[in-house]
Curated annotation (Swiss-Prot):
The keyword Membrane applies. Belongs to the three-finger toxin family. Short-chain subfamily. Type IA cytotoxin sub-subfamily. Monomer in solution; Homodimer and oligomer in the presence of negatively charged lipids forming a pore with a size ranging between 20 and 30 Angstroms. This is Cytotoxin 2. One of its GO terms (biological process) is killing of cells of another organism. GO terms for molecular function: toxin activity. InterPro entries: Cytotoxin_Cobra, Snake_3FTx, Snake_toxin-like_sf, Snake_toxin_con_site, Toxin_cobra-type. Keywords: Cardiotoxin, Cytolysis, Disulfide bond, Membrane, Secreted, Target cell membrane, Target membrane, Toxin. The keyword Disulfide bond applies. PROSITE patterns: SNAKE_TOXIN. It comes from Naja nivea (Cape cobra). It is found in: Secreted; Target cell membrane.
Length: 60
């Protein structure tokens, strides 16, 4: 699996066991990602932070 890093078009290949790409952003500024990369389990959203997770190459 290949996931974008914080600034596309940079990306990296995920290590074994991290089978999701994710994008984390603040609820107040949804168009500005705070963090991107590979993750094993999609974190829960909170009142301030949202996570978008997906399992195809460079989908974040």
């Amino acid at each position: 699996l290949k996931c974008h890093q914080l600034i596309p078009p940079f990306w990296k290949t995920c290590p074994e066991g991290k089978n999701l790409c994710y994008k984390m952003y603040m609820v107040a500024t949804p168009m500005i990602p705070v963090k991107r990369g590979c993750i094993d389990v999609c974190p829960k959203n909170s009142a301030l932070v949202k996570y978008m997770c997906c399992n195809t190459d460079k989908c974040n």
